[in-house]
Each structure stands twice: as C-alpha cells, then as structure tokens.
C-alpha cells in the first residue's frame, strides 16, 4: 500500500536535493526477512554503542519500528543501520523497508551523505566520510559545504584530520583526544609522542598549542634533559636489555655506579663519582 506521508518523510531524512536526483520509485513499504538486509560497508560510522542499540531495541519491542529502513535494489542499507541492528538484537525476523531504485554508486553516495549529517558521529568518522566523498565522488570542500550545510572551514579542518597517524585517529574515535588537540598535531613529526603526553597530563587545547609552539623553538628537543616536560617527552619508557647489560659491564669495570638515560633523540651515559680522586681514576681509565 502506498503511504502518502513517505515522500515528505524521506525528504526530511535525505534532503530535497537527494529526492529530486533519485530514479523514480514507488516508495511502497514492504515487509522482508531481516537476514536479507546488508549493512553498507562504506558507511562512516564504525562504532555502535551497545547500550544505545539496546535502548533502541527495547523501544522497538514496545512500540514497533515506526520508521521503515531505506535499502537499495541489492538490499543494502541506505539509511537506518542502527534501527536494523536494534531489530536484530530484539530477534525480530521481519521488518518494514522502502526499496529505492538506485544503482550502486547512487546508493553509496546517498548513504554517506545521510550518515554524515547525523550529529552522533565522532569527528574522525565524519572526516573519513568527507575523504571518501572527495576521493570517490569528485566533491570539493566547497561542494561538500554547500551540500551538507556546513562551513567550508569545518570541512577543510576535518579533511586534514585524515593526515594524522592512525594511533591519533583512534584516540579521536575513542574521544580521549579532542579535535582541537588533534589539529595542533597535524603533520608534526612527533605527533604521537605529544599526543600521549597531552593525554597523560590532561592538557587543554591552549596548553597543547603552547607545547607545540615551544617544541618548534627547540626548547624540548635540543636539551630534553634540562626540563621536566622534555624528560617526560623523550625518555624511553621501555627497558632495553642491551643497555642494562652495558650498565652492568661499565659499573663492574670502573667499580662505580653507572646509569644510562635513553631518549628517542639520543641519550646520556652518566658516571657517578664520590670525589675528585675517583673522577681522576675514571678519566685515566677512559684515556
């Protein structure tokens, strides 16, 4: 049966421009087996919180699935993956869908646009979605901004996040690092070292900007052992068995305490002497 409200509902969901560019379809709600439906592998959302899916699942059990899932001719989801997951969790075998008459490329583009417009994506999921649209659908930052109703600077800033090391992208996905922090680290040679320090010391964005500024002036890299931050940034956290063996050999040879401080950009070999006489003895041995 044709639902008179579906045209307006889909327009609200996907936008007037999307509707006008789609091929004609009857927009008939059909009931199909849930196992025939496939998630969209290119959708930007990669993290689905179980608690929120469970909450939606309970709501669907109590009230039914009020909004049909939108799929294409291959039964791949265009819009509604959270609802589909919630229905599977609720062990619902058949669900209402609207099948859109789209080819694979059109389906993928609309699915990406629809998901990117959601407010609960992480900034990194949004950034990856922008990148995919730019690389596969010839979007520019200007065109994306116009299509999504976002500022060009927002689009450009998020696209740049894709240049970050994967470990920092993961921190953005986990919300352990904010977009403001991450922007300070783009294209920085030691971004991962700084990111770990920022998280360990709970620095705000302004403090992170100052840290990066001082770094650029070689305040930490030139003399890392002369300040607390430099030491924490550059000192290796892992024990090196070869270095420990060397410490033992040198200590036994000179009969004094010897330590080695190993940094990512170098290190120090330290002889601990009691008095000048012992220092003279060390220097004589070294010569």
UniProtKB/Swiss-Prot annotation:
Query: Which stretches are annotated as coiled coil?
Result: none
User: Pfam families, per this entry?
Assistant: HTH_ParB, ParB_dimer, ParBc
**Transmembrane segment boundaries:** none
- The answer to keyword Thylakoid applying to this record is no
Q: Name one GO molecular function term.
A: DNA binding
Kindly indicate whether the keyword Ubl conjugation belongs to this entry: no
Alphabetized SMART domains for the sequence: ParB
Q: Kindly state which keywords UniProt assigns to this record, in alphabetical order.
A: Chromosome partition, DNA-binding
- Give the record's GO CC terms: chromosome
Q: Name one GO biological process term.
A: positive regulation of sporulation resulting in formation of a cellular spore
Task performed by this protein: Involved in chromosome partition. Localize to both poles of the predivisional cell following completion of DNA replication. Binds to the DNA origin of replication.
Family, according to the entry, reads as follows:
Belongs to the ParB family.
- The name under which this protein is listed is Probable chromosome-partitioning protein ParB
- Organism from which the protein derives: Rickettsia bellii (strain RML369-C)
């Amino acid at each position: 049966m044709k639902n008179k409200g579906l045209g307006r509902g889909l327009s609200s969901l996907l936008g007037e421009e999307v509707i006008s560019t789609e091929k004609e379809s009857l927009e008939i709600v059909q009931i199909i087996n849930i196992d025939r439906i496939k998630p969209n592998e290119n959708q930007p959302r990669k993290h689905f919180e179980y608690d929120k899916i469970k909450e939606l699942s309970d709501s669907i059990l109590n009230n039914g699935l009020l909004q049909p899932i939108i799929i294409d001719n291959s039964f791949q989801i265009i819009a509604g993956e959270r609802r589909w997951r919630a229905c599977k969790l609720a062990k619902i075998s058949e669900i209402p869908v609207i099948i859109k008459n789209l080819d694979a490329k059109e389906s993928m583009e609309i699915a990406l646009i629809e998901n990117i417009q959601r407010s609960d994506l992480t900034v990194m999921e949004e950034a990856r979605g922008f990148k995919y649209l730019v690389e596969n659908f010839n979007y520019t930052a200007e065109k994306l901004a116009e299509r999504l109703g976002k500022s060009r600077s927002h689009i450009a800033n998020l696209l740049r996040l894709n240049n970050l090391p994967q470990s920092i992208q993961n921190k953005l996905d986990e919300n352990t690092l904010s977009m403001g922090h991450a922007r300070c680290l783009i294209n920085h040679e030691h971004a991962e070292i700084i990111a770990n320090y920022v998280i360990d010391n709970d620095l705000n964005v302004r403090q992170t900007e100052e840290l990066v500024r001082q770094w650029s002036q070689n305040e930490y890299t030139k003399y890392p052992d002369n300040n607390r931050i430099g030491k924490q940034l550059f000192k290796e956290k892992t024990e090196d068995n070869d270095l420990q063996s060397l410490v033992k050999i040198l200590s036994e040879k000179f009969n004094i305490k010897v330590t080695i401080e190993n940094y990512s950009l170098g290190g120090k070999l330290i002889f601990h002497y009691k008095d000048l006489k012992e220092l003279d003895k060390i220097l004589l041995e070294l010569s």
